[in-house]
Structures are given as structure tokens and as C-alpha cells.
Amino acid sequence: MTCDDVETVKPRVAAVVVTYHPDEDVQMHLAALRPQVDQLIVVDNGSSDAAVEKLRRQGEELGFELIANGENLGVATALNRGAQRALETCAEWIFFFDQDSCVTDGFTAKMLAGYDSVAARRPLGILVPRYVDRQSGNPHPVMRLPDGSLITAITSGSLMRAGTFRELGSFADELFIDSVDHEYSFRVRRSGRILAECESAVLFHSLGMPKPHSLLGVFRFQSTNHSPVRRYYQERNKIWMYRHYGLAFPAFFAQEFLRSFVDLAKLELVEREKWAKTKAFFRGVADGLRNRMGRCL
């Protein structure tokens, strides 16, 4: 039986949410999202038994499907498992979400309308919402090309046609975490499609907790304070990405490598765990050059 054979019962809009040691806020995020989609698929990446059981109970109450991986398989694999389930159940549209993202009223309806509006004029691959930091209330700046389309797209809150995902393939499992969204964005752009923003659809999203600093009372800057593990995957995956997309998108990678060295300097100046983070940074570089991929830490 194909999806065409079950036209009358197929869920039109599916959402995939990846969880990892979810807190109480995640339950509210899922409750806000569930009424806005036909099918909600939650993929848990190795949370505690108690957390998984809580998700299971909530799934029974709200009517969503839980896929419990049992261990941390990485964000790419988790997204792929959720997307595959959506394809199996004949979804036409797929939303992807992080656990710390919360939809606003009418979010999915605005995104679907926005997608159709853009796609009527240009070949569209991914549509993202307007991201607002839930702590500060500030919008997240986006990087645009001269034609107004986006350079890359954040995965959380993004919308794709199921057919586009089927054509372009799964997220890159070998990246494990970090750069997963950049990689897929470049794959979309290389296919001749664009990335666009729907400004009317607002998604409250955690944009990190950068810490402000002042050097000599004059130079003001922010440090990212990423963990050693995050540092490792950032640098390793950046090299893998350059190997695959550097010639096609040289300006992006020039900026990314410059940012790496600036972040390393900030790390040495003001962050804690300097030695652990520095070791992770250079180990990531070394493993990237050796093409040692997958889960390594």
C-alpha cells in the first residue's frame, strides 16, 4: 500500500521534536505544539528512565508518538528517525523542533501559508520562522544573501515538504551534533532551492547564554561558554563541512574559520575550563583532518 492509497487518512502535517533530558518546560512546549499538527513524533535521545516514562505518559494524554532511542545517537540520527516515521505515515509536510523551542498561536498555519506564498514565486527548500530569544525577547539576527534569501537555516522550527526531504535525503548522521543544520542548508541550496524566513510566524527559542565581558574597561565582547564537548564537535565538523562544501560556499567558511580563532582567543582570556576546552578544540581539528566522524566523545 502506498501513500496514495490512504489519501483520506494520512496526516497532512507532522512535527518531529528531539528531546534530551527534558525539563518541565518541554512538557508545555509539546502541549502547545500538539493541537497545531496532525501528527507529533517525539524522539528521545537517551534521557533517564524517569524522563522517558514521563514523556510516555504525556504522549498518551496528548496523543503523540514517542520513539525512545535508549542512548544519545546524536541530533541528526534522532531527526532522521522522526522524519522516517513521518514519511511512513504519509505526511505531506514535516516540521522539525528542538525541545527548548515553543510555538506561538497560529504558528503552523502561518508557516504553511508562508511556504505556499514563497514557493509560488521561487523554488523553496526550507522555510524558517522568526526566532525570538525567550529570555531577552530579542529577535535572532539572520544572515541573508543579496536576493533576500537566507545563507543557512536553523533546524528548530523549520518546515519542509516531505517530498523535498525524501529527494535530498537524511541529515548527516556522521556529524552527530553541531553543523547539522548548516550541512542540510547547503544541500538545499546546492539543489537550486532557497531558504526563506516567515516573519509572521514567531518561535520562542533559546539562543544560548553568551556572557558579556570588558577588557581594560574599553573593549566589550561576549563569549559563548560552550562546553569542551561542544567545542570538539564544532571544530571537527567545521573541517568536514569545508571538505564537502568549501569550494561552493567559500565566503561562509572564511568567516567560520575566523570565528573559530576569535572564539579561541576569547576562551583563553575569560572562560573557565580553559585547558579542557583548548584540548577539545585542537582534538576536534585533528579528528576533522583525519576524517574521524560519528560520536567520538
Question: What are the functions of these language-model segments?
Answer:
Residues 242-297:
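Non-catalytic, C-terminal membrane-associated alpha-helical segments of glycosyltransferases
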Residues 143-160, 223-226:
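A recurrent flexible, glycine/aromatic-enriched loop bordering the glycosyltransferase active site
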Residues 164, 168-169, 174-207:
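A short, conserved alpha-helix in the catalytic core of glycosyltransferases
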Residues 44-53, 71, 101-102:
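A conserved acidic beta->alpha catalytic loop
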Residues 105-139:
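Conserved donor NDP-sugar-binding/catalytic core segment of glycosyltransferases
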Residues 69-88:
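Glycine-rich, basic loop-to-helix element that forms the pyrophosphate-binding segment
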Residues 91-102:
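Short beta-strand-to-loop acidic/aromatic patch adjacent to the donor-nucleotide binding site
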